[in-house]
Regions:
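Glycine-rich phosphate-binding active-site loops on the catalytic face of alpha/beta enzymes
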Residues: 4, 60-65, 110-126
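Structural preference for beta-strand elements that scaffold enzyme active sites
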Residues: 16-20, 54-57, 90-92, 114-116
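Catalytic cores of alpha/beta
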Residues: 96-110
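Glycine/Thr-rich beta-alpha phosphate-binding loop at enzyme active sites
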Residues: 51-77
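Active-site glycine- and acidic-residue-rich loops that bind
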Residues: 4, 27-43
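Extended, intrinsically disordered, low-complexity segments
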Residues: 133-174
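Single conserved hydrophobic/aromatic residue that forms the stacking wall/gate
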Residues: 1-10
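Active-site beta-loop-alpha junctions enriched in small/polar residues
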Residues: 22-32, 59-63, 94-98, 118-122
Length: 174
């Protein structure tokens, strides 16, 4: 049933492209799709891995966007089963924003090698840009120039990424 996808993986990887697949429903709200943070089936993950993908993102209770107060956390037993079922393919954690540092560290120890934190970057960008405007800096000189107006947000994203690089243990790695 995955013949077409397999052909795409072969074609794309032959052109030097990395292929990441998402299995199961990653919860949260993204592009109008709402999910609750389901747990992916390790057998399905193994089938998808056999297509020739390079990275696998699987639902382990994670969600896109901001986590609600009643979030139950990541399912590390499921993560371990998925990692073993997929022959140690590099795993991706979608919805990394707001996951406690200790959970991130444990996920990395169980095979996660890429963590998406887009929402976190968007939030710090918005906060820094809002502060710039609320302080009236957009009204001073040419503070309305988009390069000046957006600079605090860009710097906030840079600072957040540096913080996460340290947390994820990536500093100094190629």
């Amino acid at each position: 049933p995955y013949r077409r996808q397999r052909q795409m993986c072969i074609r794309d990887s032959s052109k030097g492209m990395s292929i990441e697949a998402e299995v199961g429903s990653i919860g949260g709200v993204e592009d109008g799709v709402v999910g609750n943070g389901e747990i992916a089936d390790p057998a399905e993950c193994a089938k998808i891995t056999d297509l020739g993908i390079d990275f696998l993102a699987a639902g382990i209770g994670n969600i896109h966007g901001v986590y609600p107060a009643n979030w139950k956390g990541l399912d590390f037993e499921a993560l371990d089963r998925i990692h073993k079922a997929t022959n140690n393919i590099p795993l991706v954690l979608h919805g990394g924003t707001g996951i406690p540092d200790d959970m991130i560290a444990k996920a990395i120890s169980l095979g996660v090698s890429k963590i998406n934190i887009n929402t976190e970057c968007q939030l710090v960008f918005a906060e820094a840009t809002r502060k710039y405007i609320e302080e009236g800096k957009d009204q001073q000189g040419k503070g309305f120039d988009p390069r000046k107006l957006l600079a605090p947000g860009a710097k906030a994203i840079e600072a957040k990424c540096k913080e996460k690089i340290e947390l994820f243990g990536c500093a100094g790695k190629g």
